[in-house]
Each structure stands twice: as C-alpha cells, then as structure tokens.
Curated annotation (Swiss-Prot):
GO CC terms of this entry: actin cytoskeleton; cytosol; nucleolus
Record's keyword annotation contains Amino-acid biosynthesis: no
Protein location: Nucleus; Nucleus, Nucleolus
Record note on quaternary structure: Interacts with NPM (via N-terminus). Forms a pentamer with NPM at a ratio 4:1 (NPM3/NPM). Two pentamers form a decamer.
Function as written in the Swiss-Prot or TrEMBL entry: Plays a role in the regulation of diverse cellular processes such as ribosome biogenesis, chromatin remodeling or protein chaperoning. Modulates the histone chaperone function and the RNA-binding activity of nucleolar phosphoprotein B23/NPM. Efficiently mediates chromatin remodeling when included in a pentamer containing NPM3 and NPM.
Origin species: Mus musculus (Mouse)
Entry PTM: Phosphorylated.
Coiled coil: none
Source organism phylogeny: Eukaryota, Metazoa, Chordata, Craniata, Vertebrata
Name assigned to this protein: Nucleoplasmin-3
Length: 175
C-alpha cells in the first residue's frame, strides 16, 4: 500500500511539473532579461550620417526601436530626406528612405517602434537639417545555463520509476 501511495505521489508530482513545462521532454523556457536604453542622434549639414553599431556578444540580441524623427531648432523650410542603410534578409546592404520632413508642413514623423537590427546607418540624403532621431536600444539576453537546483530536480526525476498498474484481485465466494 505504501509503495502504491509513493508511486501515486511521484506521478502527481511529475504531472504538475509537466504542466508547468519542466518534465516529459518539455523544457521550461530559458530565463530572458531585457534592458532598454534611450537612443538619440542628430543629422545635419555638418554630420550627414550616423552609424549605430554594437559589439557582438554571445546570447545577446540588440534591437534599435525608432520612435520619432523631427526637425529641431535651426531648421529651414526645405525637404530633409532621411534614409536608413541596413541589411535585408539576404544580408545585402539596402538603403530605404524613411522620412521626408519639411518645417512648414511635416516637421516631425512618428514611426511607432520601428525595429531595426544593428548595424544601422542613418543618412541625411537631402536637406541640411538638423533632424533628431529618437528611439530605444533594447538588449535581450537569453540565459541557457541551468542552475544547480534545476539539475538536481532533473536527476531526481530520472531516478523515479512508476510502478505498473496491476489488475485487482477477485475474491471467490463473494457475489
């Protein structure tokens, strides 16, 4: 009877962990940490381009999420075309105009979390600016290391053996 109760308890423990994603071939997702920092640069007649680069690190992904491009103090009423130079899905360099700003009709443009993978270069293709580009630099780190506690839990689970279900004994002489 005690062996049956222990087996049932082990089974329930294993099932509750499986529902949480930790047993039976299912893995708990690796812990993810995310940091977010303000980003800003200014393009003008003196500084016509800016390149956003990051150092390559293991298990770290960088995302530049643009929020707004706007003309700042000192801008004249001319067309200011800003283009982004980045890599496409084939890893080929591609230049795409993202904003055409003019002081009298469209002095700013909200791009609502437009995400880019570094390295990214911003160029003032035409006009003299100054154009301010703002956004967020997001750093996502995935930690694939298992803690000692998780490793111990896995070794305990390997040791647990479930007893097979035996048919009930029938008593003769009882209806």
């Amino acid at each position: 009877m005690a062996a049956g109760a222990a087996a049932a308890l082990a089974f329930l423990n294993q099932e509750s962990r499986a529902r949480a994603g930790g047993v039976g071939g299912l893995r708990v997702p690796a812990p993810v940490t995310m940091d977010s920092f303000f980003f800003g640069c200014e393009l003008s007649g003196h500084t016509r381009s800016f390149t956003f680069k990051v150092e390559e690190e293991d298990d770290t992904e960088h995302v530049l999420a643009l929020n707004m491009l706007c003309l700042t103090e000192g801008a004249t009423d001319e067309c200011n075309v800003v283009e982004v130079v980045a890599r496409d899905h084939d890893n080929q360099e591609i230049a795409v105009p993202v904003a055409n700003l003019r002081l009298s009709c469209q002095p700013m443009l909200s791009v609502d979390d437009f995400q880019l993978q570094p390295p990214v270069t911003f160029r003032l293709k035409s006009g003299s600016g100054p154009v301010r580009i703002t956004g967020r630099h997001q750093i996502v780190c995935i930690n694939n290391d298992l803690s000692e506690e998780e490793s111990d839990d896995e070794s305990e689970e390997d040791e647990i053996k479930l007893c097979g279900i035996l048919p009930a004994k029938k008593h003769r002489g009882r209806p």
